[in-house]
């Protein structure tokens, strides 16, 4: 029983590594937004819409990793 519990904790910890990628992805999206607005301020509204879309896609991958982690901890 202790081995199964340890495996659940290790699996949940490993599955949260995907959150690192989501954080980096969000940082890249908003860095590109700042760079794009500084180059062409008149495109601010259009660039912001694309940045929010990129943020949502990046955040979704992080939430999927977090969901798998919770499923490993509490679902099995």
Curated annotation (Swiss-Prot):
InterPro entries xrefs = ATP_synth_F0_csu (IPR000454), ATP_synth_F0_csu_DDCD_BS (IPR020537), ATP_synth_F0_csu_sf (IPR038662), ATPase_proteolipid_c-like_dom (IPR002379), F/V-ATP_Csub_sf (IPR035921)
Question: Does the entry feature the keyword Cell inner membrane, yes or no?
Answer: no
Q: How does it sit in the membrane?
A: Multi-pass membrane protein
User: Which biological process terms from the Gene Ontology are attached to this UniProt entry?
Assistant: proton motive force-driven ATP synthesis
User: Where, by residue number, does the polypeptide cross the bilayer?
Assistant: 13-35, 50-72
Keywords for this entry?
CF(0), Hydrogen ion transport, Ion transport, Lipid-binding, Membrane, Mitochondrion, Transmembrane, Transmembrane helix, Transport
Quote the cellular component terms of the Gene Ontology held in the record: mitochondrial inner membrane; proton-transporting ATP synthase complex; proton-transporting two-sector ATPase complex, proton-transporting domain
UniProt lists the family membership as follows: Belongs to the ATPase C chain family.
Job of this protein: Mitochondrial membrane ATP synthase (F(1)F(0) ATP synthase or Complex V) produces ATP from ADP in the presence of a proton gradient across the membrane which is generated by electron transport complexes of the respiratory chain. F-type ATPases consist of two structural domains, F(1) - containing the extramembraneous catalytic core and F(0) - containing the membrane proton channel, linked together by a central stalk and a peripheral stalk. During catalysis, ATP synthesis in the catalytic domain of F(1) is coupled via a rotary mechanism of the central stalk subunits to proton translocation.
Subunit and interaction comment? F-type ATPases have 2 components, CF(1) - the catalytic core - and CF(0) - the membrane proton channel. In yeast, the dimeric form of ATP synthase consists of 18 polypeptides: alpha, beta, gamma, delta, epsilon, 4 (B), 5 (OSCP), 6 (A), 8, 9 (C), d, E (Tim11), f, g, h, i, j and k.
Spell out the protein name for this chain: ATP synthase subunit 9, mitochondrial
The species this protein belongs to is Eremothecium gossypii (strain ATCC 10895 / CBS 109.51 / FGSC 9923 / NRRL Y-1056) (Yeast)
The major lineage groups are:
Eukaryota, Fungi, Dikarya, Ascomycota, Saccharomycotina
């Amino acid at each position: 029983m202790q081995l199964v519990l340890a495996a659940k904790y290790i699996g949940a910890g490993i599955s949260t590594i995907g959150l690192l990628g989501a954080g980096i992805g969000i940082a890249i999206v908003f860095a590109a937004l700042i760079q794009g607005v500084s180059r062409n301020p008149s495109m601010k509204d259009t660039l912001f819409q694309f940045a929010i879309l990129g943020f949502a896609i990046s955040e979704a991958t992080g939430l999927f990793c977090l969901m798998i982690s919770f499923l490993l901890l509490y679902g099995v």
